[in-house]
């Protein structure tokens, strides 16, 4: 899923074995789901396949669950610098700038994740979305939520999430990753779409019931625009001035 391709005018070179993602001039990734009627996709990202062993800042309108199964992962969401410990997962809501960086170059770093739109849960105008889901997915003070497993309800969420990963693994819906590299045990389902839907709903039911325990922060739009400009400036410097810069 990941890697980075800037517009053709940037002169960025990409090796054949690098994972790629198409971003526009605002660092937005345009999501295209294989099945628009069931808009959810499963990926396993190997952060070793990235330049600098990191997924650069980008954003998209879909929601994302990302899990650290092999090692701790440095995560940036907006201005927040977070450490996702091995065994933890993070939910990042739509429209948030985010990036990932591995911490142990010598260790494997396969990270299962899912990206999905609100339509896979419920229509935006439905009672279910307006009464329950929007409090988690559309709260500007809740750009991300770490699922640490320290509490029983967090462990329940992790179990639901990894059941979803397992169902997709069993179905062979593993984007850009060889089956023998799958970091999650496959889980057969006679009704995979229904089971994925049920587990997603259970996750958000739990989050809603424990919403008062979630860590709320504020990420403003001006901050996001500033980060986009800074990221583009750094990319310009890195590609046009490969020599070490000094103040002399």
Segments (PLM) and residue ranges:
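A short beta-turn/loop motif at secondary-structure boundaries
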Residues: 57, 82, 105-106, 224
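Ligand-binding loop in jelly-roll beta-barrel domains
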Residues: 95-119, 127-128
């Amino acid at each position: 899923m990941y890697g980075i391709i800037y517009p053709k005018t940037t002169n960025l070179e990409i090796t054949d074995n690098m994972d790629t993602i198409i971003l526009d001039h605002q660092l937005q990734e345009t999501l295209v789901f294989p099945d628009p009627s069931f808009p959810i996709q499963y990926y396993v990202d190997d952060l070793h396949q990235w330049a600098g062993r990191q997924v650069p800042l980008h954003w998209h309108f879909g929601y994302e669950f990302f899990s650290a199964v092999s090692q701790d992962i440095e995560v940036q969401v907006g201005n927040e610098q977070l450490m996702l410990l091995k065994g933890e997962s993070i939910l990042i809501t739509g429209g948030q700038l985010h990036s990932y960086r591995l911490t142990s170059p010598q260790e494997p770093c396969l990270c299962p994740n899912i990206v999905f739109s609100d339509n896979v849960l419920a229509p935006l105008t439905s009672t279910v979305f307006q009464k329950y889901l929007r409090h988690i997915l559309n709260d500007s003070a809740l750009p991300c939520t770490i699922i640490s497993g320290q509490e029983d309800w967090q462990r329940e969420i992790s179990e639901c999430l990894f059941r979803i990963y397992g169902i997709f693994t069993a179905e062979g819906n593993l984007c850009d990753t060889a089956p023998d590299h799958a970091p999650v045990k496959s889980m057969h389902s006679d009704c995979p779409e229904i089971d994925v839907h049920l587990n997603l709903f259970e996750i958000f039911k739990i989050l809603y019931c424990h919403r008062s325990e979630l860590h709320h922060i504020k990420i403003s739009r001006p901050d996001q625009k500033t980060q986009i400009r800074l990221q583009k400036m750094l990319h310009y410097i890195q590609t046009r001035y490969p020599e070490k810069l000094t103040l002399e």
